[in-house]
Regions:
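Conserved beta-hairpin
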Residues: 1-25
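Short acidic, Gly/Pro-enriched loop/turn segments at secondary-structure junctions
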Residues: 35-42
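A membrane-cytosol interface segment of integral membrane proteins
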Residues: 42-81
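Bulky hydrophobic/aromatic packing residues
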Residues: 23-25, 39, 74
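Generic beta-strand structural signal
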Residues: 7, 33-35
Length: 81
């Protein structure tokens, strides 16, 4: 299966090479793409994170578009607290 990131009002589903996991918006602190990193990551509590293999720096414009799309959904659904 190909890596994938899907988000809706309930939360975010991430499929990486090691399986698929769902994270409700309440436990997500946002998405980051650290400088020099190969892929985006979803920030979780306690300084943990999940790599997002579906959004890689080598994909250039597609990665930028996917990150923008995620941030729009994040702004719409992620709790403010």
């Amino acid at each position: 299966n190909r890596p994938r990131l899907r988000a809706n009002s309930d939360g975010v589903e991430i499929r990486n090479i090691n399986g698929t996991r769902f994270y409700p918006w309440e436990v997500i602190y946002g998405m980051s793409f650290p400088e020099g990193s190969r892929m985006a990551r979803i920030e979780l509590p306690n300084f943990e994170y999940v790599p997002v293999w579906a959004i890689q720096s080598g994909d250039k414009e597609a990665a930028i578009a996917a990150t923008r799309n995620f941030r729009e959904l994040e702004a719409k659904y992620m709790p403010l607290d």
